[in-house]
Structures are given as C-alpha cells and as structure tokens.
Amino acid sequence: LIHQETLDLLEWPRLCQHLSTFAATKLGTLAAQQLTIPATEADSQQLLVQTQEVYWLDQQGQGLPFGGIRDIGDDLLRAQRQGLLGGDQLLAVASTLHGARQLRRTIDGQSPEDLPVLQALVANLRTYPELEQHIHHCIDDRGDVTDRASPKLATLRDKLKSTRQDIQQRLQRIMQRQAGALQEPLITQRGDRFVLPVKAPQKDAIPGIVHDASASGATLYIEPQAVVSLGNSLRQLQQQEKAEAEVILRQLTEQVAAVAEDLEDLLAVVTELDLASARARYSLWLEANPPRFITADEPITLRQLRHPLLVWQQRHEQGPEVVPINVLMSAQLRVVAITGPNTGGKTVTLKTLGLAVLMAKVGLFVPAREPVELPWIEQVLADIGDEQSIEQSLSTFSGHIRRIGRILAALEQVPPPDTHSPTPPLPHSPTPLLPHSL
C-alpha cells in the first residue's frame, strides 16, 4: 500500500491527469485519473507488456480504434433494476457493442506472436451482434422507435397519419367558409388539439371548444366542433402508439438486462485497453523507454532521466528546459544521501526517481535513456518539504514526524547485508534516498 500522502508529495495525481488526456474514451479518462497501483510485480509486468504491445501496434500504424465506445454502466444498472431504457440509451449500447467488436477484430487480426497478452484479454469478449442489429432495427438514428419495430405500431401510425389528414382537411374547409372570422388563415395547436385563431367578437361563427386566448383577448383559439371527435380519436391513437413504443423499449431493455453481466465485463476490457493505449501514447509523447525490473543483486540504471511533469510544463506551458539526471546505484548500496546547496536540484531528483518507480509499477515507460533498469519496489515512502519549526506550524511538523516514522519503520524490516539469518533478504528491498534536509 502506498499512502496517499506520498502520492501527493510526488505529485502523482498530476501525472495521472496528464495520462488521462491520452485516453480515447470517458471510461479510460476516469480510470487514468483514478489509477490503481498494482500490488505485485507480476501485475506490473502484465501492464508493461500490454503497453508494449499497444506501442508496437501504434508503430505499425494500426492503433486501437475506440470509436463508438460509450460509458453505458449506468444504463446497464438501470436495465438490471427493471428501469426503462430510452432510444438514445439503447443506441449507446449498440454503438458500444459495435466499437468493442472493432477493437477485437483489430487485435485478432495480428499475429499471436505480436500481441499474445492483448489477444488473451479479448478472447472471451462477447459483443452480441444480434442485439446490436435488433436495436438498430427498432430504433432510428434520432432515438425514436421505428415503424418496422412491430406490425401493431406500424398500423397505429398509419391511422394517426390518416386522422391528422382528416382533421387538416376539415379545418381547411372551415377556413375557406369562415375566412372573415379568422385573425389569420392558420391551423395551429394548443396542447395536442388542432385549433383556429378566431376573432373574439366572431367566436359564434365557428362553434367549438376554446382552448386558449391571446394576451390581449382579441384572439380565441378554438377547436371547431366538426373536428372534436377526430381530435379525441387522435389522442387515443397517440396514447396507444406511446404504449406500443414503450412495449418495444421494454423488450429491448430486457434483452440488454439479460446480458448485462457480459456487457459489464466488456466495459472492463475496453477500459483496460484504453488505459493501455493511453500509457503507450503518453510514453511515446514522453520519448520514454520500457523499464526492466531487476533482481536484488543488479545495479539500478537510469540515465538521462527526466521529470515527466517538467517535460509537460516545458511543452505545454513554455517552461524551462528540463535538465536530465543520471541515477546509477550498485546493488551493495543500502542508503543514498543527496547533499548540496539550496535550489541545487535535490528535491526534483527525489521526486523524479519516485515518479519513475511509480510509472514502472503502473505499466508506463520511464522517460530515460535505454536501458531502464530498476527494482520493483513494494513501498514508496517520501517526506519532502522545507524545514519547519514547531512555532511556525505544529501540524506541518507533526506531519513530517509521522511520515519519517513510517519510513524508519519500513527500514527496520530490511535485513542488513551481512545477516546470517536463514531467511533470505527481501527480493526488492527498498533503497532509501534521503535528502540532506531530513
């Protein structure tokens, strides 16, 4: 477990925010911003291989396509809870199924030797093309239920069209006969009723139901008695049409609910792929190289290591040129103390090394010259800041003491180099780096 205090001191959340800008989907963006740090070296190694495979794919000009992928997690939950999905939500499901299928085709289209990890990741991905086709059969591009969704719906809509035409024709005839009673020759609507704008003094010329009046009271909007019965029929047909459309939406929602667990797995795979793609693109942008996790008897080698946040600042905010550092440590070293004058780069060096360790753990390449060789470190602990007196800030001072206590407790768990204990040393014991201010 890496404490959030340490991550904040190293400005890890800022790096995650930068990583998220390379994601292609909302799912990937959110996952990058809330990046999980693996608990085992095997998990980190798996993520690194994913990054390398996507990196290779990008270099071949065949990057992963994420078009059409939507965050449908809430829609799946709604369907599982017997809610009703609307047309737009169903289209999002269909679009995501299609997008996931394109992702799988791109990955499966490569040689198994080139993308073994990614192909294993999508091997059990179910994209339900028949569900996608059924949704598009029943829902048009605007999210409305289509006439072809059911024979009953088509019949109701034919009747609706015919009834509207009858109403329009009758109103046209009334307008021709009673033109002098109208404010203007116009058929309009109030609510779901068709009405004519009649001059108030001549309302008796067109008997019917008054549904509205103008602000001045000079115009009354009257539904002529001759079309009231048709208006009632129209309203009934509209209610029947709405009910039938909801039947279609309910059927489609139930089909989505029936496969919701598979679709949740699909979203998880898509998110993992988008994260891998974001890591690869961010690594390429940083001109970084893949790290190799070394054993306890190998030296740490980080040449021309650059602080990733300073690289971002230089390129996006016209910051100063980033000065690279070299970190070369033999396996025999137990502690490294960095000394030097103020503003000499000690803190930046510590933060750069801390971020390099974290980047390797989450499957990112490290912005250093090849070879990039460092141990997989389980615990990363940091206490970075200026000296504080108790009088200046008791809370700040207490915070320093608490963090230093954690570091010392972790150091007590590391066996000395000359131990004769039958228990072997930890395979990746942390090498503390202490700034002179501590």
Language-model-detected regions and their locations in the chain:
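Conserved amphipathic alpha-helical "coupling/scaffold" segments
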Residues: 1-152, 156, 259-262, 266-272, ...
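ATPase nucleotide-binding head domains, primarily ABC-like/P-loop NTPase cores
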Residues: 286, 296-438
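Intracellular alpha-helical coupling/juxtamembrane segments of multi-pass membrane proteins
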Residues: 156, 160-163, 237, 241-276
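Extended, charged coiled-coil "arm/hinge" scaffolds of SMC/Rad50-like chromosome-maintenance ATPases
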Residues: 127-140, 230-250
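Phosphate-binding P-loop/Walker A region and its immediate neighborhood
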Residues: 254-315
